[in-house]
Regions:
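Cysteine-centered motifs
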Residues: 20-21
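Hydrophobic, aromatic-enriched interface-forming segments
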Residues: 175-182
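N-terminal catalytic or cofactor-binding beta/alpha core of small enzyme domains
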Residues: 11, 29-169, 182-191, 211-235
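An accessory alpha-helical subdomain
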Residues: 198-204
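Extreme N-terminal basic, low-complexity initiation segments
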Residues: 2-4
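Conserved TIR/SEFIR loop-to-helix hotspot centered on a Trp-containing motif
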Residues: 172
């Protein structure tokens, strides 16, 4: 992992070029650049890797002048949101983008909505298996992503990669963390934008499976994420 001071210095250098000014001018303005927290889940369901975090790790530390903060979170209903909360409190990001695996999907999909429901088809990594439970008793039935979903999809496609909008994040941990981060933003961080991106299986995962499944190389998944984030930063 790169030293954070080094990352910040590179960020200042890029911004100085972009805005035709001195690095010292940018350093004097601590709010001059955006912070984007990007999370990815650990492996679950018997898989040895999770393409979500593997792709997140490949993201540049700076995208369009924004600092990218990368974080692995557990595929656990209760613990995942607590770790994201800690990171939000510590880093004060402008944007939170959670990334998860949706095996069977053919490309990267940007989620539009999360629902107030946990209904696990398989146990999470802590053995928890909620059935028809509300995620937040006092929360609304659903939250819409506050990211520019269609612009994200369009920018990925503009770079020659497949991408689409999804209108269901499921009822597993992916939906849970998307809903709860949006709930956190609505209650405590009204200026923070948040949303979710699902990625397909990696080519590595499906190589030895008994039946053919849609997949993408990790590097292509990472590029798709990068282009999606570009659209968020440019908005």
């Amino acid at each position: 992992m790169m030293d954070m001071d080094y990352i910040k210095e590179k960020l200042y250098q890029q911004l100085a070029i972009d805005y035709c000014c001195q690095i010292s001018d940018i350093k004097d303005d601590k709010n001059h650049f955006m912070k984007v927290l990007v999370t990815g889940f650990d492996p679950f369901g018997g898989e040895s890797v999770n393409p979500a975090y593997e792709a997140v790790k490949l993201l540049p530390d700076i995208i369009e002048g924004a600092q990218i903060i990368k974080l692995e979170i557990p595929t656990v209903f209760k613990k995942s949101i607590e770790i994201v909360k800690e990171a939000v409190e510590k880093d004060k990001p402008d944007v939170v983008i959670n990334v998860g695996q949706a095996g069977g999907r053919a490309c990267v999909t940007v989620e539009k909505v999360a629902i107030n429901l946990a209904d696990a088809g398989i146990p999470d990594n802590a053995g928890d298996s909620p059935e028809d439970e509300s995620l937040e008793k006092d929360g609304p039935d659903a939250y819409f992503s506050t990211l520019p979903v269609k612009a994200m999809v369009e920018n990925v496609r503009a770079h020659g990669l497949p991408c689409s909008v999804s209108y269901s994040a499921g009822t597993y941990v992916c939906n849970s963390v998307m809903y709860r981060v949006l709930h956190l933003a609505a209650r405590s961080y009204p200026n923070m934008k948040a949303g979710f991106i699902h990625v397909p299986y990696s080519s590595e995962q499906v190589a030895n499976k008994d039946r053919p499944l849609a997949s993408m190389p990790i590097e292509i998944i990472a590029k798709s994420l990068e282009h999606a984030i570009e659209a968020v930063v440019k908005e």
